[in-house]
């Protein structure tokens, strides 16, 4: 095996593809059922009302409505306020 590198070879130049993690829908935004709200590794955000959690810890909407972020018992939660409730609160 050669102990000197041949011309123009490099041991660099490899990296993994970015995973595009993060919050996809922010507080106050309207979502439809099934829309992804947060892509994450581990449970940085926990599912709250009307929010489901996928096998890769992705949070998604179970109902149409407005996204709401909050904290409960030191955990960051993501809730969906259903569209009917949001309309009722606005008129009240």
UniProtKB/Swiss-Prot annotation:
Q: Which UniProt keywords apply?
A: Ribonucleoprotein, Ribosomal protein
Q: Name one GO cellular component term.
A: cytosolic large ribosomal subunit
- GO biological process assignments: translation
* InterPro entries found in the cross-reference section: Ribosomal_bL27, Ribosomal_bL27_CS
- List cystine links: none
Matching Pfam families: Ribosomal_L27
Location of region: Disordered:
1-26
User: GO MF terms on file?
Assistant: structural constituent of ribosome
Superkingdom classification of source? Bacteria
Could you list the residue ranges that cross the membrane? none
Q: Which family does it belong to?
A: Belongs to the bacterial ribosomal protein bL27 family.
Q: What is this protein called?
A: Large ribosomal subunit protein bL27
């Amino acid at each position: 095996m050669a102990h000197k590198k041949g011309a123009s070879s490099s041991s660099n130049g490899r990296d993994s593809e970015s995973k595009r993690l993060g919050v996809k829908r922010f507080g106050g935004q309207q979502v439809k059922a099934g829309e992804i709200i947060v892509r994450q590794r581990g449970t940085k955000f926990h599912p709250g009302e009307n929010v489901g959690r996928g096998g890769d810890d992705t949070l998604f909407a179970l109902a149409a409505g407005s996204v709401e972020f909050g904290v409960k018992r030191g955990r960051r939660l993501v809730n969906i306020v259903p569209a009917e409730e949001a309309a009722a609160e606005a008129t009240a």
